[in-house]
Amino acid sequence: RVNINAGWEHKTMLMESERDLPVAGRSLLSASDAYVIDGTIVQNIDKVTEASLSLRFDQTDSLSLLGLDTLGSGQPLRRDSRSQNLTGSASVNGMLGDWRWAVTGNYSDADSLIFTERLGGTRERFDSTQQSFGGNANISGSVMDGWAGPIRASITGGYSGLRFDSRSERGIAVTTTDLARDTPSVFGSLTIPLLDPDYNVGNVGRLSVTLNGQAERPSDFSALTSWGATFNWGITGNLSLLASYKNDEAAPSVSQLGAAPMETQNVSYYDFATGQTVEITTLTGGNPFLRAEQRRDLKLGLNWSPPMVEGLRLSIDYNRNKSYDTANGFPLLTPEIEAAFPGRVTRVGGVLVAIDQRPVNFDRSTNSQIRWGFNFGKSFGQQQQPQAQGRSGERRPQGEGAGRPPRAEGGESGAPPQGGEGRRAGGDGARPVGDAAPSAGAGARGPGGPGGGLGGRGPGGFGRMMGGQQQQGGRWQMSLYHTVKLTDKVLIGPGVPELDLLNGSATGSGGSNRHLVELDGGLFYRGLGTRFSAKYDSGSRVTGGSAGDLKFGDLATFNIRFFADFNQMPKVTENMPFLKGSRLRLSIDNLFDAQRKVTDANGIVPLNYYPGYIDPLGRYVELEWRKSF
């Protein structure tokens, strides 16, 4: 099977003046052109062996304006950039007796070139190249028959490498960076059934335990180990419990350790000490003295599908994380943070003029939360059997534990992915993504709008709604989940008061929101469908000392998708053949143009927190037509 895709996306510039903001000649969102082409080849070598190869190239050219050149021409200062990315991966998997094996390899090359105009007519240049490569081999299968069923094992050996080179030219000053990391690793897991009525062992359902461990040795850091255990207890066919614990070590990233220092001038920043928004100089880069992070994660979960209500699944999860020596970007400069890092802050006559924002280690962070809710969905109408995929009509798994093992808990309780699980999500939280998760390598949508690159919002939900099947009937689905943060605390260092992020302290762009409600649903019938999603998170408060507090208001956002898959409308394609192989999608993000309101103690919105700065894009409408040839 061969699949080739190509695309182009053009975005116009959004100026501050279009959002009634005071700075002339400065853009909120850059203008850009993005191009992408990718292809995939899947080949059956024999009855039990399959190979695949995928390649992708994308390029993005962008232009942003940084304000007027008040010391020179008086024209807007420009920043021109070009990024190019080439990625490739290959895999082969098959069977060796009763054991499944898989071998994968990957390579990526990311190049970036940036020209920035400065006051007085000077021009800076920054270019960088990052190469990532690696591979792994996995084998998994049944080791032996235990007293309650077969004992299964999975072993993965892997290697990953990274090379990063950059050069920064500022006048006669030239700064270069040359970073490298090689990381061999080994991962193993063992699943042991403990109870199973089918084997006449116990009469209280099926109970199993999965033990896992990992060791890796980054070339620029000390050896790291991880281990964990997961208990799965299927009490009945409709009721299951999960408990897992993971002890994990993680090294700071290469850039956190060794990125070249870079100063950025004229950055708008809210000073909690004075209650004013000021223009400052920030210093970013790496910190070679960062320590390894140690994480302790506990998860308890329950899933229940009431037999009296078909298609309904209820779930509740409890997550607790305690981490030591967490590597973080420099936090929001509240009075508490300034007292903990006085050497990182420069003031002249009490006025904030500069901050050293290079990464730091927090001594300890602890957080816990409960997430509960339901999934409800049913099929209706006449169903068509799934079309065959590959040789056997089903997607071939890549082997138990294939690939680099994730750092998440060693099991899932069946609920959709949770935001903020394990590591804490900072700040206000991101706007809900679209109807499907972005593809690998696609630009994720961050503050201010879509990420760079094509495909950042996913394909429109066809696969997610239909599970890869083509159906003549229909299906509807809805889920509602509520997350409640119980604790969220950070200890910056010994002798410094602990920060309670749920009660006035902050490390990110705002406080920590205690409540998060997520609604998701959709309807699909004979090629036509819609998806909707909504998210509400409660507000927060940041204690500002003598300047007063900042209040971050509640925020509710709604997204909706309408789509048509003409592959499932034979009568339409017979009359209009050019629609064969095409899909049409209308997307509206942030349907009601909701924006978080931030006010100080006097009810005034600080300049740095104007809605145009927090979310310059607002409502986003997109019409997309895709056609396969």
Task: Cite the ranges covered by each PLM segment.
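C-terminal beta-signal and adjacent terminal beta-strands/loops
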Residues: Q398, A402-M466, L486, S533-V542, ...
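Transmembrane beta-strands of outer-membrane beta-barrel pores
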Residues: W8-T12, F57-L63, L96-D98, Y107-D111, ...
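Residues that define the transmembrane beta-barrel architecture of outer-membrane proteins
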Residues: A31-Y35, R82-L86, T129-F133, D178-V186, ...
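C-terminal beta-barrel architecture of Gram-negative outer-membrane proteins
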Residues: E409, S413, Q418, G426, ...
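Residues on the lipid-exposed face of transmembrane beta-strands in outer-membrane beta-barrel proteins
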Residues: G39-Q43, A90-G94, G135-G141, V186-I192, ...
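Repeated loop/turn-to-beta-strand initiation elements of outer-membrane beta-barrel proteins
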Residues: V2, K47-A51, D98-W101, I151, ...
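Surface-exposed, low-complexity loop segments enriched in small/polar and acidic residues
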Residues: N3-P184, P197-Y199, V204, E249-F289, ...
